[in-house]
């Protein structure tokens, strides 16, 4: 890639590539739920047979996954700061592979939800440690690029999941019949475990000649035993909370949206608990106005990501996109755009990093264009147009801007945070952001069931992104002077 041939392959390039693999399998595992549920709804199989409100229930399953995912965001970053980013990253991928395999083995709605929540709990610790590990081991001028390149795994995972899962179901139908929905979980879970072993072997920092590594630094140390113990304890508590809310809500006859709102309320309650118990560490992350605005900005970002990530195949199919595989092909163009958008956004972000509000201004432009493109796509399909080529182009272009803005925002948040707190900050950012992911699948599904069309959910998506633009414009970025140097930084 950029200047790679000139400088040769560096250790941080290897780290970017390995974390790309981590993102790839993480997103295949989580995005698989949407196409599988779409298949189950259409064919009325398993626990979706004779259900009156299938999209609402399917969306609720997605929201329960993201509730677990959301709750582990800050603990994941906190554990990374304590036991090492690398240890938590690798534990996350192993956990995801096992949870995915078990989802395919079990039967029944409750067991399905249980292992989707467990998947969310395991994958919830990945994000903050991945971002922090890249920031620690990359040269300052290449942090945005590194974050963007690693995140292309998101795009490839989204595309592979959107296209590959329907294909795997079709492949399995002749020998598994209505249990064909299980087959993708076996395949993706196995691939995830293979990647976990690769990360265990190769995701290691490299000593720089003349630079003494700080073995106590979270970017260097890797305490797997303690990391797994505390990760298990946090997950056990949150699993009981999430499943408890689900069982009590169902017994009380609450709607899917009501359950999602209750799950969302766990976010401020967890922040309050953390503030009371770890005030000295949490207060700076909440008192920084610019960081807080970025936390809120990521709510519509996650809403958009999982509105499309969960329901895109169903959206395209409902608006005349053909059979399941044909609709999946059109929908995949949105995720495919990230292969260009993520590294391009990261590179542009680095180019303007030294300018006053440089990253902020780029982020505002990308968000503004994306907002317009969301409304254009909504208007096109709501007027009855369904040309698959046109829809594919629209989804690809909007995806280009959507994925490009994310490494810009991540690098901006990193600029605003001291080195020792990056893991906790990214954990806090994604904790708040996952409010959007928790609400998006179920609210969108309920609105779809009540209106009979995906038109209103699309318009709601655009309105939320417009609100995100307002938040970005209120940010005034100022870099934090770092007091410690990572090996990548010390050598330059």
Language-model features, listed with the residues they occupy:
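Extracytoplasmic
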Residues: 14-48, 161, 308-313, 440
């Amino acid at each position: 890639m950029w200047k790679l041939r000139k400088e040769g392959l560096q250790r941080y390039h290897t780290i970017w590539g390995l974390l790309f693999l981590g993102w790839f399998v993480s997103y295949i595992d989580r995005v698989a739920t949407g196409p599988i549920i779409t298949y189950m709804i259409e064919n009325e199989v398993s626990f979706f047979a004779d259900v009156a409100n299938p999209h609402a229930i399917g969306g609720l399953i997605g929201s329960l996954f993201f509730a677990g995912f959301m709750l582990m965001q800050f603990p994941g970053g906190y554990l990374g700061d304590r036991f090492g980013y690398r240890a938590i990253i690798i534990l996350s991928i192993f956990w995801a592979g096992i949870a995915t395999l078990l989802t395919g083995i079990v039967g029944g709605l409750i067991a399905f939800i249980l292992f989707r929540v467990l998947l969310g709990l395991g994958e919830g610790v990945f994000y903050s440690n991945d971002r922090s590990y890249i920031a620690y081991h990359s040269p300052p001028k290449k942090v945005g690029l590194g974050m963007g390149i690693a995140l292309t795994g998101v795009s490839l995972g989204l595309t592979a999941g959107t296209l590959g899962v329907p294909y795997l179901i079709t492949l399995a139908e002749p020998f598994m019949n209505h249990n064909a929905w299980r087959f993708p979980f076996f395949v993706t879970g196995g691939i995830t475990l293979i990647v976990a072993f690769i990360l265990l072997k190769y995701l290691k920092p490299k000593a720089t000649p003349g630079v003494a590594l700080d073995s106590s630094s979270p970017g260097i140390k890797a305490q797997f035993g303690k990391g797994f113990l505390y990760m298990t304890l946090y997950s056990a508590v949150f699993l009981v909370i999430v499943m408890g809310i689900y069982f009590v809500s169902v017994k009380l006859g609450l709607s899917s949206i009501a359950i999602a709102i209750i799950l969302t309320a766990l976010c401020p309650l967890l922040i309050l608990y953390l503030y009371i118990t770890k005030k000295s560490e949490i207060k700076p992350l909440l008192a920084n106005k610019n960081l807080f605005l970025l936390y809120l900005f990521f709510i519509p970002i996650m809403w958009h990501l999982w509105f499309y990530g969960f329901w895109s195949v169903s959206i395209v199919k409902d608006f005349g996109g053909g059979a399941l595989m044909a609709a999946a092909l059109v929908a995949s163009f949105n995720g495919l755009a990230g292969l260009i958008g993520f590294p391009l956004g990261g590179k542009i972000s680095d180019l303007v990093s030294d300018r006053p509000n440089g990253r902020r201004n780029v982020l505002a432009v990308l968000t503004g264009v994306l907002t317009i493109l969301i409304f254009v796509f909504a208007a096109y399909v709501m007027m009855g147009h369904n040309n698959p080529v046109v829809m594919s182009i629209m989804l690809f272009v909007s995806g280009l801007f959507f994925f490009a803005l994310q490494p810009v925002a991540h690098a901006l948040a990193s600029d605003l945070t001291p080195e020792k707190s990056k893991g906790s900050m990214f954990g806090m950012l994604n904790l708040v952001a996952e409010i959007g992911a928790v609400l998006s699948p179920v609210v969108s599904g309920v609105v779809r069931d009540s209106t009979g069309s995906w038109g209103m959910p699309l318009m709601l998506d655009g309105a939320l992104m417009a609100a995100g633009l307002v938040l970005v414009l209120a940010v005034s970025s100022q870099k934090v002077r770092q007091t410690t140097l990572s090996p990548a930084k010390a050598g330059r």
